[in-house]
Amino acid sequence: GYDHLDIEYLKRAHITWTNCPGCNANSVGQYIHSCLLLLEKEKGYNLSKTTVGLVGVGHVGHAVIEAIRPLGVQILLNDPPQKEALRKAGKPHEFFLKMEELQEKCDIISFHTPLITKGPYPTFHLANKTFFNALKKQPIIINTSRGAVVDNTDVLQALKDGIIRDAIIDTWENEPNINQEL
């Protein structure tokens, strides 16, 4: 992502920049795959009986699907912007579920969204106190998207309160000044 760049400043300074959407997608897929294998080995998870919810199914989300499908996990998908685009195009979109369904059914919820602060589908602090309090199971939360998609203060409290089983954090809110307690 490039949410940390001051695009207007770069334009004024005549500095050219580019981004490469999806360039690390396969690496993230491999990372999630290895996390699931580690959960199986060290925590005794039976992956064939594990439901994984993916929030965000763009370049990275698709790579994660391809990487974890062979493990036998059930995969549930949530991506409101893609669902809306498919619906408007008259294409099948029913496989995208509401967040509430992931909160109810998933043993693991993994975030793969850009950081969006405005508009119809904001992702800033998408996983916050309200999100955690609505969980029906005690899932593991994985964040490999942008740090501020998961409110780090709230995920820490959810861990302390036993609302979530564990958290796998690959990207932190306020990097490099991360929450050391988390």
Where are these regions (language model features)?
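Residues that form or flank phosphate/diphosphate-binding pockets in enzymes
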Residues: 5, 27, 63, 150, ...
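Short beta-strand "acidic-cap" motif of Rossmann-like dinucleotide-binding folds
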Residues: 75-77
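Rossmann-like adenosine-cofactor binding region
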Residues: 84-181
